[in-house]
């Protein structure tokens, strides 16, 4: 697996949001994932240090996991089908491993809140771009 980090969230002239995940080690490879406006908001808020007046869905998920005795451990971008990426949230609960199917945007929003690593399966490298080809 390849560890990633959130580089930025962009919006194009058509109003489409994209989260750009860069490989954490070399910072040369970018995996762009198109997301919705609310999902972009959910990812950017904790990165900017903002706290909503009421819990957003990822905050609720984090609280529920923790109240049920779980500890989020990592997020994995597992695959792609058509234009849709797939992800998993890995949780440790009393020594047992729990894996939840997730949209990547929700998993990433949880990862930035819990400060847990984001990974992608190595075969997804064919869907990445060189960072020098991306205009921020």
Residue map of PLM features:
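Divalent-cation
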Residues: 1-136
């Amino acid at each position: 697996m390849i560890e990633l980090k959130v580089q930025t969230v962009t919006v194009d002239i058509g109003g489409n949001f994209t989260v750009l995940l860069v490989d954490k080690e070399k910072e040369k490879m970018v995996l762009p994932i198109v997301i919705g406006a609310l999902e972009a908001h959910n990812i950017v808020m904790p990165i900017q240090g903002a706290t909503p007046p009421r819990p957003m869905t990822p905050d609720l998920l984090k609280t529920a996991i923790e109240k049920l005795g779980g500890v989020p451990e990592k997020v994995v971008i597992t695959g792609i089908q058509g234009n849709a990426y797939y992800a998993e949230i890995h949780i440790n609960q009393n020594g047992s491993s729990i894996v939840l199917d997730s949209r990547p945007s929700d998993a990433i929003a949880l990862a930035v809140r819990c400060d847990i690593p984001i990974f992608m399966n190595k075969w997804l490298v064919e869907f990445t771009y060189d960072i020098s080809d991306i205009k921020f």
